[in-house]
Regions:
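Structural signature of tandem alpha-helical TPR/SEL1-like repeats
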Residues: 524-525, 556-558, 592-604, 627-639, ...
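Amphipathic alpha-helical scaffolding segments comprising HEAT/armadillo-like alpha-solenoid repeats
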Residues: 491-501, 523-535, 553-564, 587-604, ...
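Short coil turns that connect the paired helices of HEAT/ARM alpha-solenoid repeats
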Residues: 502-506, 534-540, 565-571, 609-611
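Structural marker of alpha-solenoid helical repeat scaffolds
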Residues: 521, 536, 552, 567, ...
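Primarily the internal scaffold of c-type cytochrome electron-transfer domains
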Residues: 4, 47-53, 61, 76-144, ...
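Helix-start (N-cap) detector for alpha-helical repeat units in TPR-like alpha-solenoids
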Residues: 508, 539-542, 570, 614-615, ...
């Protein structure tokens, strides 16, 4: 798998935008997901040897047997797997696995030249280390195979780091057979959060779970060391089929010592047979086929989703067949991960795209199109689509309006456009959508027409489509307008979002996204939408409804979220625990208190599992703070800063905790420490300004609050607070001018409009005050 989870973003996306979004500290979520995990479910394999063939292995229980035990019987499947990217997801660095040029090859980036060479049969790179000095590092493992290969370097604390200089393994005629940097348009040097020695490129957390089988991270917070282990170094048979020891015993003995259920399962932990006995038939000769039996489970899709989804791990020990949301928390269709219409933007790894699709809604599974053992398509070109969609109807110029043998005649050219990640890795969008240049013209979303016709604009493309079909394009995904309205804080955004959330005909992942996009102030209609979401049979919708309640009044949170403390899925239980962490015990019934304590223990365990990350420590610190445990909260937030001094939310949250504790002088010190690390971080300057206000140092506060607006002019909240500070110091004209300027960019910002009404009223200008009061009234009613 060339998909490297150490990069959770498109290298070509603007660094400043994504960095800012990652560092928003209010209600910290790690990589747009809660980071978690908890108690350990120990599994291993028949051979208890701790080391074999140089691989670090788990040797705890008799369950994982290794792919070699499988391919001895399943030769056809094994042969396909041996040639797959799953097989080559990770390997020990040797003459067979290493594809890159290590014959004293040189590569220069950011003014520094790295040299790739061999010594005593081993592979090395001389490159910039975390201290900025050129150092020799041994390449320990290869990572991926095509279209690029990365290399892992092991440090003394057993931390593996992914080098940001990768090998382009494509043929030379395609531009390959060269070294290249994954961030070619940026200047990533030591100290940068994206430097290869930093947490963002750490294999143990960012990559390992998807590139090896049955991974155990084994981080020790007391020593800040790892002892990461796996059952198999790459993605083996058991990564998808589950531990195979019982199946091996069954196959060898044919006299099963199992229960009746185990006999019927042949000792397998999961049966991936959802397509068995299923036929796709056409109700009429020219119609699309219909599945003979509705898809009855998500087993296959969830097995793929463990890696082919943008998600955070909330528990360790996933084995195929267990509920996905017991172990992972997936990202929804939010910006900047997706465009407003749901098209992929950042690296989202397929699952979130596919769940939006009409194919998924009609029962298609991953293996309908992909051979699960080779990873290849079941047919090439339009022939794959023609297994369901009539070629005579769709593979014709009357449908696609392009030359029959041209690139535009390919089904995927229009319905699965590519986005290139990691510089050279194009990946197709699996939302399988109808091109919508009309949406592009109105909302700024991309479309596949202009992906090829780059010399034309979206309105031209929309006109062409209308001429071809006599109408605007019509797609299955209908939520773009609502999500775009939410981004723009449009007056009707909330109503549009509620409509999407309530429409069972929309994809569940879109309905879930609509719920989390509902923003404060949460009126009765929004709370009703969330209450309905909490009762929804779809788990993603329930989880999103909980997330959306973070801005609800305490009484509403308790009333609505308490029943979810006993949900069947762990991701939902711990979200409910986090949401209700600050509820006083005397407000809870005995049953609620018991459920909250149990779910809170799961939440704490989930963050403890990720104690190697500053994000996990901040999450835990905030949780303790809401529970009233200030001592442990301070400890965790300080630990986060020590673990990763570049993680800005740790400073902001610790300072905010000191505010709650009445220790603003200490908060000021923390914020100034953070500003030394990130002098251009607007959040820290804004927080420092507020701290100085509380410390009665108004002039100093005004400097910091203004600095925040300069560093982040697009943040309406910063402008609003700065204007309030100006007004409080008697600078009414300057305050009003600042607010009016911000209102031009954010015409529907309630705080700005309300402040203008208030400021004009305070100076006796009733006409202007009424104008803005009426505007606010209209906006609120909408």
């Amino acid at each position: 798998m060339a998909q490297n989870k150490s990069r959770k973003r498109n290298a070509n996306t603007l660094k400043t935008e994504q960095k800012h979004r990652r560092l928003l500290w209010s209600g910290i979520a790690f990589l747009s997901m809660v980071i978690a995990s908890g108690m350990i479910y120990f599994v291993a394999y028949l051979n208890p040897t701790a080391e074999r063939d140089g691989e670090k292995r788990v040797a705890l229980a008799v369950q994982y047997v290794g792919s070699s035990a499988c391919v001895s019987c399943h030769a056809t499947e094994g042969s396909a797997w041996l040639k797959s990217q799953h097989h080559d997801a990770m390997a020990q660095a040797d003459e067979h696995s290493v594809l890159g040029n290590f014959n004293n090859a040189r590569f220069t980036y950011a003014g520094l030249t790295s040299t790739f060479f061999k010594r005593d049969g081993k592979f090395f790179v001389n490159t910039e280390g975390r201290d900025g000095k050129l150092t020799d590092y041994e390449i320990t493992y290869t990572f991926g195979v095509s279209p690029l290969q990365q290399y892992l370097i092991e440090f003394p604390d057993a931390r593996l780091q992914a080098l940001s200089i990768a090998w382009d393994s494509r043929p030379k005629k395609d531009g390959g057979q060269r070294w290249f940097h994954l961030y070619p348009k940026e200047r990533i040097t030591h100290g940068d959060e994206l430097h290869w020695t930093g947490p963002a490129q750490n294999w143990n957390f960012m990559c390992a779970d998807c590139h090896s089988t049955e991974l155990r991270k084994n981080y020790d917070p007391a020593t800040d060391r790892f002892q990461t282990q796996w059952a198999e170094i790459s993605v083996g048979c058991e990564a998808c089929h589950g531990p195979g020891s019982n199946h091996v015993v069954w196959a060898k003995s044919q006299s099963p010592p199992f229960s009746k259920g185990e006999v019927s399962s042949k000792g397998l932990t999961i049966s991936l047979d959802e397509r068995r006995g299923v036929a796709w038939t056409r109700p009429s000769p020219d119609s699309n086929p219909v599945r003979s039996r509705a898809r009855s489970s998500e087993r296959e899709i969830e097995v793929c989703a463990q890696c082919h989804a943008r998600r955070g791990q909330i528990f360790e020990g996933y084995t195929p067949g267990k509920p996905f949301l017991d172990y992972y928390r997936p990202a929804l269709l939010r910006r900047p991960l997706y465009y407003a219409d749901g098209q992929q933007r950042d690296e989202v790894y397929i699952w979130g795209s596919f769940l939006q699709s009409k194919m998924y809604a009609n029962g298609v599974t991953c293996s309908d199109c992909h051979n699960p053992h080779s990873g290849k398509l079941r047919a090439e070109g339009n022939s794959l689509c023609a297994t369901c969609h009539l070629g005579a109807k769709y593979d014709t110029p009357a449908h696609h309006h392009h030359k029959p043998d041209g690139a535009g005649a390919a089904c995927v050219a229009c319905h699965m456009p590519t986005t290139t990640y990691m510089v050279i890795d194009p990946r197709r969008d699996h939302s399988l959508r109808v091109p919508r240049p009309d949406l592009s013209a109105n909302l700024g979303t991309p479309n596949s027409c202009n992906g090829c016709h780059t010399n034309r604009d979206a309105r031209w493309a929309a006109t062409q489509v209308k001429q071809w079909y006599g109408r605007d394009a019509q797609g299955y995904q209908r939520f773009a307008s609502a999500f775009s309205a939410a981004d723009a804080a449009a007056p009707d955004a909330q109503a549009q979002l509620r409509a999407i959330a309530a429409d069972a005909g929309d994809p569940a992942i879109a309905r879930a996204t609509a719920l989390v996009e509902l923003s404060a102030p949460l009126g009765p209609a929004a709370l009703d939408a969330m209450a309905a979401g909490l009762r929804d049979p779809n788990a993603l919708v329930r989880l999103a409804a909980l997330q959306s309640l973070s801005g609800a009044p305490p009484d509403a949170r308790l009333r609505l979220a308490a029943p979810l403390l006993a949900d069947s899925l762990r991701a939902i239980r711990i979200e409910a625990a986090n949401l209700l962490a600050g509820v006083p015990e005397d407000r809870l019934s005995t049953e609620q208190r018991t459920a909250l304590d149990r779910a809170a223990q799961e939440y704490v365990a989930s963050q403890r599992y990720n104690a190697d990350r500053a994000e996990g420590r901040v999450n835990l610190g905030n949780f303790y703070a809401r529970r009233g445990d200030a001592e442990n909260a301070v400890t965790e937030l300080k630990a986060a800063i020590k673990l990763n001094p570049n993680f800005i939310p740790a400073y902001a949250n610790l300072a905010d905790l000191y505010r709650v504790l009445g220790r603003d002088a200490e908060g000021e010190s923390v914020l100034r420490e953070g500003i030394k690390v990130a002098p251009k971080n607007a959040i820290l300057h804004h927080a420092l300004g507020l701290a100085l206000v509380r410390l009665k140092r108004a002039d100093d506060a005004l400097v910091e609050l203004e600095r925040a607006t300069v560093l982040e002019p697009g943040n309406p909240r910063f402008a609003y607070v700065y204007a309030v500070a100006l007004h409080s110091m008697g600078k009414s004209d300057a305050a009003i001018a600042r607010l009016k300027k911000s209102l031009l960019a954010y015409p529907n910002d309630r705080d700005i409009i309300e402040a203008l009404a208030s400021f004009y009223s305070a100076r006796g200008d009733k006409a202007e005050a009424k104008k803005y009061a009426d505007r606010l009234h209209t906006l609120t009613n909408n």
